[in-house]
Design a protein with these regions (language model features):
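Conserved glycine-rich cofactor-binding loop
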Residues: 15-16
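The beta1-alpha1 cofactor-binding region of Rossmann-like NAD(H)/NADP(H)-dependent oxidoreductases
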Residues: 58-69, 101, 214-215
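Substrate-binding pocket helix/loop in short-chain dehydrogenase/reductase
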Residues: 95-96, 100-108, 190, 201
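Active-site helix of classical SDR
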Residues: 119, 155, 163
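Alpha-helical segment proximal to the catalytic Tyr-Lys
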Residues: 124, 168-172, 229
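Residue(s) in the substrate-gating loop at a strand-loop-helix junction
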Residues: 139
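Short, small/polar-rich loop/turn modules that mediate ligand/substrate recognition or access, typified
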Residues: 171, 176, 231-233, 239
């Protein structure tokens, strides 16, 4: 079992299906977690349930407050941030010809720009500690494209390219930057897909099933651990073989 005792972690998007699974797995490792999200009720439930978790309602689209948020998080975690997990993200699907400027801008702002600004602010803290890990959750469609998601696919592809650049810039400073690219994962979002189309999607997956949030969380824990210390600038695909089929 991987242990992350005395490891300080910031997790964004902690109240969603994948985010909550990441949080629960982090807790089993003994990590100290600051979990963020926009759903105050769910954050309150997290705070009551787990003793080694701090929660903070924070909208990552508020770019002007990101550095201030990281400064406060650094203080509340005892002056050291070891790991940042950028999991928060949104979709605003539409065919490209119908896509409104605000649909494009909102997705790029939150999924790409906010991820960059959070990483930038955290790197400043990690440079002082001379170590750190940044894990960015992307998506299979950032590699394959997808109908009706020009904004989302561009944002996730951008995160992959940005992560490679950060890995090159800060590798010598002992800061690892990696991505995890989920395929189709069983969440509230995929639960809304009708059964017939689910079977069509599964037929394109060599393992013939959707993944679980825990599949993603297990990969996150690996990248958080010392087992991944010599891995940086990489994207781990967790999609049952769909990307390669």
């Amino acid at each position: 079992m991987i242990e992350l005792k005395d490891t300080n972690v910031i997790l964004t998007g902690a109240t969603g299906g994948i985010g909550n699974s990441i949080l629960e797995n982090l807790i089993t490792t003994g990590a100290n977690v600051l979990a963020t999200g926009t759903n105050e009720d769910k954050l309150n439930l997290i705070q009551k349930k787990y003793k080694n978790v701090q929660t903070e309602k924070f909208d990552i689209s508020n770019h002007l407050e990101i550095e201030n948020f990281i400064n406060k998080a650094n203080e509340s975690l005892g002056g050291r941030i070891d790991i940042l997990i950028n999991n928060a993200g949104i979709t605003r699907d539409n065919l490209s010809i119908r896509m409104k400027d605000e649909e494009w801008n909102e997705v790029i702002d939150i999924n790409l720009t906010s991820t960059f600004l959070l990483s930038k602010s955290v790197v400043k803290k990690m440079l002082k500690s001379k170590k750190g890990k940044i894990i960015n959750i992307t998506s299979i469609v950032g590699h394959t494209g997808n109908i009706g998601q020009a904004n989302y696919t561009a944002s996730k592809a951008g995160v992959v390219a940005m992560s490679k650049s950060l890995a090159l810039e800060y590798g010598k400073k002992n800061i690892n930057v990696n991505c995890i690219s989920p395929g189709f994962i069983s969440t509230e979002m995929t639960d809304k897909i009708n059964d017939e189309y689910k079977e069509v999607l599964k037929s394109k997956i060599p393992m013939n099933r959707f993944g679980t949030p825990n599949d993603i969380a297990n990969t996150v824990i690996f990248l958080c651990s010392k087992l991944s210390d010599y891995i940086t600038g990489e994207t781990i695909h967790v999609n049952g073989g769909m990307y390669f089929s």
